[in-house]
Amino acid sequence: MTAKIVIAGAGSIGCYVGGCLALAGKTVTFLARGRVAAALARDGLRVTDLDGRDHRFAAGSLSVEIDPANALSSADIVLVTVKSGATLDMAGLVDRYAPSAAVVISLQNGVENASRIAAAFATPRTVLAGMVPFNVVLTERAGESLRVHRADRRPYSG
């Protein structure tokens, strides 16, 4: 069985990490707001880095959802990649819609976010803290794929 991974917050970090997971053959759904969801559906996603990675996902080739219930209801893993200010709102959506067995991983700036997520759940869940030790730049140009670029050479596995 392939784990269904939901990227809960399809901004620069979410799109980059999700794109890398999709490149590795993982089943990924992006939970995105309207503007990003529309850009991904219309123009696709381009994942690049300083080491020469340059991959385009064609329009319509990625699973993109704007409805949290649809995105989260069958998640095995939820990667929370929203800005810290939106942590509790996203935790509420995960609590409401994701299966209780789903593993939740915070990939956010700030040392308290994983514990804030765990505290927001009505019943205990597995919540882990992760980190993204590199910068990602998101570029959006009309008629081009939404581009996420790893903008430094710090090592990562992916």
PLM feature spans:
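Rossmann-fold dinucleotide-binding core
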Residues: 73, 109-158
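Residue-level detector of alpha-helix initiation sites
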Residues: 12, 85-86, 111
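ADP-ribose/adenylate-binding Rossmann-like module
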Residues: 94-112
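Rossmann-like NAD(P)-binding element
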Residues: 58-100
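Nucleotide donor/acceptor-binding cores
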Residues: 3-4, 76, 125
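N-terminal glycine-rich dinucleotide-binding loop that anchors FAD/FMN and/or NAD(P) in oxidoreductases
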Residues: 45-64
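NAD(P)+-binding Rossmann beta1-loop-alpha1 motif at the extreme N-terminus of oxidoreductases
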Residues: 1-51
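Redox-cofactor binding/interface segments in oxidoreductases and associated redox assembly factors
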Residues: 78-80, 106-107, 129
